[in-house]
Every structure is written in structure tokens, then in C-alpha cells.
Design a protein with these regions (language model features):
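Alpha-helical transmembrane segments of multi-pass small-molecule/ion transporters
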Residues: 1-291
């Protein structure tokens, strides 16, 4: 609950004091730092990475992104982009921590973090031009390199450190909590950037913001609900977190870099909804069903 309070405070600060918007370029490096601390002591298990349930998660991400973008496009192309980018967001680095609190299989969810983040980093710059064939988005090597670097560089560095400097890894593990505060700083910058855009540049009606919030709420309910349903009694918690708790900060960076801050409102609203749901799960307590 305390972490949820920090989250809402960071969002409120970005709305009330948006002057930090000019530093939004730091979000890229903050994401890399968050992933670095999250993956610091990760032991890659090929069996977990090849779990067929991860294939189901990837298939559902694509299916939900494609379907919701298609439906939203009936209303506007802007809403279609919001739906697609939000739905294709990968599993959040915080999902394994949440799964541990809920007494689930942490190894599976951590594998989902690695696999889905790599997948989204590869897929988004390739698919976005098909969804939005405008001037700001294009299939080029630089866009692909930018997204892949954010995910793969922290993974490569942490795995190399485990192999060649294990003592340094052991010394850094107690500081993993720093990643949370880096996340809060990134959320503030993203909110400030979106707020400044709405106040100074956007010509869209306020009704669009309500529609974006509704799409994010619907996607959040669909992802968590579908994940739990697909996982059944045995894997519902793990698949629910893998599909539902998303690395929306990565999607926000994609929006700010390749699209517009208005599109970034989709994953920003999703952050609020997924944290409200996870706060409910924590208050409810670990699952009582047998595993």
C-alpha cells in the first residue's frame, strides 16, 4: 500500500509540477536501470524460458493488441494506437515480486519478464508503422536498435556480471530496492511530459482523455482476467500477473519517442489501474487455492 501511495504521489507531482518534462529523455536510461536491478540475480533457466505457457502469453498479447486496435480504429486512429501500444506492453519487472507475495511460481514470471520484454522490443518498431503509417514512425535500424538496447543491454550486462564478477553481484543485490525509486522518477517525468503536452500543445478534446482511460481500464480487466482464466486453478496467479502486470514505462517511452505524449496516456492510466488491482490482491492476501 505504501508503494501505491508513492506511485500516486509521483503521478500527482507530474500533473501539478510539469516543469520536469524537458528531462523526459532520461526515461530511456531509467528503464535500463530498473531492468538492471531486477535482473541482477536472475538465473536463466532454459526450461522456464521454453515453458509453453509463455507462448500462450505472447499469443494473447498479439491477439489482444490486434483485436482492440481494430475495434478502437472504428472510433479513431489515435485510440487504435493507444489500445495497441498498451496491450503489447511486456510483463513488468515488478510482476515476480508481486507473484512472490501471492505465493506463486516466481521463476515462471521472471522468465516472462525476459521473454516478453525482448519480444515487445523487437515487435513494436516493426509493427507500429503498419498501425500508424505516418511521418513519425518508420521501420529503420535505429528504432529497432533503440528498443532492443533498452531490454537486452541490462540482460547481457547482468548475466556477464554473474559469470565473471559474482562478488560484485552479491554486493549490489541489497541495493535492488533503488530500482523502485528510479521507477518513481521515471513516472514523474512521463506524467510531466504528458501534462505539458496536454496544456501547451494538444488540440484534442477532454473527452478523448476519458476514452483513453476507458480503453486502459478495459485492457487491464481483460488481461488479468484472461490470464487467470487461461492459467486455471494451478497457474492462474502466475499467468494473470504475466499478462496483466505490464511494463507500461517501456510503452510510455515508445509513445514519447515514436508517437505523441497523448498516446502515452494509455499506458499511464494502465499503471494506475493495475496498481489498484494489485493493491486489492495484497489486501486480500495470498491465494488460498492449492497449487
Amino acid at each position: 500500500m505504501k508503494k501505491s501511495a508513492f506511485l500516486f504521489s509521483a503521478i500527482a507531482l507530474g500533473i501539478l509540477l510539469p516543469q520536469g518534462y524537458s528531462y523526459a529523455y532520461l526515461i530511456r536510461y531509467f528503464i535500463m536501470g530498473i531492468l538492471f536491478f531486477s535482473l541482477l540475480d536472475l538465473k536463466i533457466d532454459p526450461k522456464s524460458a521454453l515453458n509453453p505457457r509463455l507462448g500462450t502469453i505472447l499469443a494473447m498479447m498479439l491477439a489482444i493488441a490486434g483485436t482492440t486496435a481494430w475495434v478502437s480504429n472504428w472510433f479513431s486512429s489515435e485510440l487504435a494506437l493507444v489500445a495497441f501500444v498498451t496491450a503489447l506492453a511486456p510483463t513488468a519487472a515488478a510482476a515476480p515480486v508481486m507473484t512472490k507475495f501471492l505465493h506463486g511460481r516466481v521463476e515462471y514470471v521472471m522468465s516472462s519478464v525476459v521473454v516478453t520484454n525482448s519480444f515487445s522490443a523487437l515487435a513494436l518498431p516493426l509493427v507500429l508503422p503498419l498501425i500508424n503509417p505516418g511521418d513519425r514512425v518508420g521501420i529503420n535500424a535505429l528504432a529497432l536498435l533503440n528498443t532492443l538496447t533498452i531490454v537486452l543491454l541490462p540482460l547481457i550486462v547482468t548475466q556477464a556480471m554473474q559469470r565473471w564478477t559474482p562478488r560484485l553481484v552479491t554486493a549490489l543485490v541489497p541495493f535492488k530496492g533503488i530500482g523502485f525509486y528510479v521507477w518513481m522518477a521515471a513516472i514523474y517525468l512521463a506524467t510531466a511530459k504528458a501534462t505539458h503536452f496536454i496544456q501547451a500543445e494538444s488540440t484534442s478534446p477532454w473527452s478523448l482523455i476519458v476514452e483513453i482511460a476507458a480503453i486502459s481500464l478495459g485492457l487491464c480487466a481483460l488481461n488479468f482476467g484472461l490470464g487467470r482464466w487461461l492459467g486455471g486453478q494451478d497457474w492462474g496467479q502466475e499467468m494473470g500477473q504475466s499478462l496483466g502486470q505490464k511494463n507500461t514505462l517501456f510503452s510510455i517511452w515508445v509513445c514519447l519517442t515514436f508517437l505523441t505524449p497523448a498516446i502515452a496516456l494509455g499506458p499511464m492510466f494502465y499503471i494506475v489501474f493495475q496498481n489498484l488491482y494489485n493493491s486489492y490482491l495484497l489486501a486480500k492476501g495470498p491465494r488460498s487455492e492449492s497449487v
